[in-house]
Amino acid sequence: MLKTIQDKARHRTRPLWAWLKLLWQRIDEDNMTTLAGNLAYVSLLSLVPLVAVVFALFAAFPMFSDVSIQLRHFIFANFLPATGDVIQRYIEQFVANSNKMTAVGACGLIVTALLLMYSIDSALNTIWRSKRARPKIYSFAVYWMILTLGPLLAGASLAISSYLFSLRWASDLNTVIDNVLRIFPLLLSWISFWLLYSIVPTIRVPNRDAIVGAFVAALLFEAGKKGFALYITMFPSYQLIYGVLAVIPILFVWVYWTWCIVLLGAEITVTLGEYRKLKQAAEQEEDDEP
């Protein structure tokens, strides 16, 4: 398989097809859909603990009280399908119940939220096929930093966007602000995926590969979100089957689909670098031939 791809790269015929074959081979070898299923399961298990920890962080900083409400609505409006309002009510009820837990239960919530971070780390390093492991203390520090600073940075960015929105009275900035707010979810997804693909793997990732893979993942995520919402709106047959429980399979499928997109972006990032190495090796062999 690699020899065929190498030959195609050597003769510079149909390089895109050769790259796509390499991408498909990696997806198959890494069992990407199985990894996505594992991450979806852990995500659903960690969803309420993760949201509870995030809301607790915002509660600890009074200056983010207004921003936390905006961030909550922004997340459910832009990162969940059309039934986000229903899911939001259920999750907020679960989080309210979790606030009544004891200190031991609160520690359990934090551990469960960190479990999601560990699963993401493990899945991405499986795709990058990295054998190097971080020290446990360092990994815990990174997970905790993401868990604590991530929501605060998101809240700060949302506060900035709200401030820009308040400047709409300035006619000269009106069009610019509208365009920025319109593409803000895409930019946020792009930056998030880029950081994920650049920081989490324990090996060095070329920045341009991470940017390309993150951009493709962000585009697929936004397109998938709109397509999924359109399907739910136009073909509501799931409601006839599941009734009031319809929100459960919708959330399951959406989380699984989201992780498929995230891991596909990672596979694209890896394949770009691997194909470039194969092409360089093929060109070197061509130069060495008499």
UniProtKB/Swiss-Prot annotation:
The chain crosses the membrane at residues 44-64, 104-124, 140-160, 183-203, 210-230, 244-264. GO terms for cellular component: plasma membrane. This is UPF0761 membrane protein YihY. It holds the Pfam family Virul_fac_BrkB. The gene is yihY. It is a multi-pass membrane protein. It is found in: Cell inner membrane. Belongs to the UPF0761 family. Signal peptide: none annotated. Disulfide bonds: none annotated. Keywords: Cell inner membrane, Cell membrane, Membrane, Transmembrane, Transmembrane helix.
